[in-house]
From Swiss-Prot:
Keywords: ATP-binding, Nucleotide-binding
Top-level lineage group: Bacteria
Protein name as annotated: Uncharacterized protein MG342 homolog
One Gene Ontology CC term in the entry: cytosol
């Protein structure tokens, strides 16, 4: 198991401010970065699951378990995670390699959200993901809200916050 943190980017926009933050974390923390958009699959449906469980989801869950610490970086879309990310997470919950609904079992995690708004759904996203990921076996070490983002924004204080949680 790698001691190098694994960053999971839950944004699918090429110009996402969350991508910028994830890349800054990757460099400063000497972490590995994967983008959930690379693991997109069909919209979850029980019928699809019975016919063929996506191998790329099984592979992704195994990759998560190659690391002790996960750092989730997500935008907020109307107070929730992006739809494509929610779908991929739904599929991951159906993978029983580590127990029913335990795809994050025995892993440590930090959840981050970057938003341009001073007051936003970012806090709600962090609360929801903290509860959900805890239910899925993750030991949530903390959450970092980066709000009020603008051009020229300094991520360093927030990177330091993440470092303290690792």
């Amino acid at each position: 198991m790698s001691t190098k943190p694994l960053i999971l980017l839950l944004a699918n926009s090429k110009n996402s401010i969350n991508r910028k933050f994830a890349k800054a974390l990757e460099q400063q923390l000497n972490a590995e970065l994967i983008e959930l958009v690379d693991y997109q699959v069909d919209f979850y449906c029980e019928d699809l699951e019975k016919d063929h469980f996506p191998e790329k989801i099984k592979s992704l869950v195994r990759k998560l378990h190659d690391h002790k610490t996960l750092i989730f970086v997500t935008p907020e879309h109307n107070g929730f995670v992006p739809a494509f990310a929610k779908n991929t997470i739904d599929w991951m919950t159906r993978d029983t390699q580590y127990g029913k609904n335990q795809f994050l079992k025995e892993l440590d995690g930090i959840i981050c959200c970057v938003t341009p708004a001073a007051k936003s759904g970012g806090k709600t996203v962090l609360e929801l993901l903290t509860k959900f990921f805890s239910f899925s076996g993750l030991n949530v070490k903390g959450a970092v809200l980066v709000n009020g983002y603008h051009d020229g924004f300094d991520f360093q204080p927030f990177i330091t916050d993440v470092q303290k949680l690792i």
